[in-house]
């Protein structure tokens, strides 16, 4: 028998808490869990016992790395909360959670207002069309300035943000808030850990200011709501319900962002912000239809939350849980799913069985029999599912748009300290790359080194630390490396002759090969132009193979040789002594002999680099790109920032994240992707050859 849905869709909220690092986001989430009855003791991030920060690294560093999903209940609503990291190296976690959320709470530090990472997460939320409310936190701090924080939302983010509350006092004197819609004051009792407050008429000394601010709020709402505008201009009374309905509509349309005040640490204002989540953020029924694609026809299919429709969900996170093993976090868009059922992984076209379904609370869990549309839950038993995969009813396959995964920007070698560590490291890297698509691991066939790449130095530090702690792997970390290549720039004909006579059967292979540069990206091409059997048919594949093997270690510094055409046009053989092995060696000798005449050069990877910076740092940023041998491709404006497009050699990009951070006071960000290979300048080529101990021709 089908299970009954516990909360109606209209009373469900899927929200994220997003902020700059240290704005008090984890503490805010803690308080939400405390006041909604999910935890009985308040944990503090700075004491290392916060409920949401459940990985050991997070507890030590006091920052949130993994977005933990938690279910809470406020009044008669279910709120699914995803706690997201505020550090720029963990942007994928933020992207992931925004992708599956319906609304978000942006937490600001009342002292700092909008900070660099706030700009980044705000831009990401704009990309995914996520409605937001703002919580100005840390009102108890010296220097807290609510009005300045609201102003920073306008100036830095160009957001139509308006206070729906006014703080009573600040720093030591902060004691509560005035509700500008209902025109009442909520004043907290210091002794009750924020669970008790008195709702009283607005104190006389705040009345005039509160009236002024309410008028400003109505004016801001009138700008985005015709009905309110009409009443406002006509001097008619606007009821509280009308005002709330207009704010909700404008917030859902991304035209308005209500701002709240509070101090999570001092237990003030969190409940009113929770009311804001219910009043102004969307239920799964309020969001735009979700667009999926039919894999058979390619047609677009619109998904609206509906339990009766076929099941469709997105796997948005894989975690290795200490108690249940591999855990897949899913967001259900339509339909329902019982534990024990089979689903189709439409992204990989394979059937999988969902063993158990769990509702998550930071790092504890409750088993549930069924999930419904709009739910966020953990699934156990999905062995082949990875981040971004679509899980659907086996008879109704759909591909839900996958996550935008940025490419890693830093790569280092990692070496196990012992043979025993080697096997454990392979298992650890496989698990960690499954969990995090921006973390990659590969073995370099040229050096045998294992290379790991990620979004920044902190990202890789934490991955190495997790290998040590969770998988007991001790490893040494090397310096960042660049994968160079070699190629020919001129035509060259060369002979390769291999003759060996050492008693008994000898060795004989003789070839003439014409080498020419190939088009970029075309790789190696072999042409057989032998006439009259001067090289017998059976030895020709050996010539091709010999060349391919020789090209793995180039002629200048041992880097792979690429984009070369080889035409075998002459040669000779010996009736008895010729063999496949002899022709293989002859081919490699021809390649070596051609090198000096073929204008061999070392190629370096050139990255397409996009830097986003506030305009005031533009000169410094452009100067820094030029100093790194970069070439400018163009510039554009976006959301109050300048975007610079350029091409820069990868070898010059090491340490750039730190340089950019310091030259833009942490407000600049960049992305880079591999674009093409290009010859290195002569002086740099000589340095590379010297370091590798090769011979410059």
From Swiss-Prot:
Q: What GO terms are given for molecular function?
A: GTP binding; GTPase activity; translation elongation factor activity
InterPro entries attached here? EF-G-like_DII (IPR053905), EFG_II (IPR041095), EFG_III (IPR009022), EFG_III/V (IPR035647), EFG_IV (IPR047872), EFG_V (IPR035649), EFG_V-like (IPR000640), G_TR_CS (IPR031157)
Q: Where does GTP bind?
A: 19-26, 83-87, 137-140
| Gene Ontology biological-process annotations | ribosome disassembly
Looking at the keywords, is Protein biosynthesis present? yes
Similarity-based family: Belongs to the TRAFAC class translation factor GTPase superfamily. Classic translation factor GTPase family. EF-G/EF-2 subfamily.
User: What this chain does, per the record?
Assistant: Catalyzes the GTP-dependent ribosomal translocation step during translation elongation. During this step, the ribosome changes from the pre-translocational (PRE) to the post-translocational (POST) state as the newly formed A-site-bound peptidyl-tRNA and P-site-bound deacylated tRNA move to the P and E sites, respectively. Catalyzes the coordinated movement of the two tRNA molecules, the mRNA and conformational changes in the ribosome.
The name under which this protein is listed is: Elongation factor G
Gene label: fusA
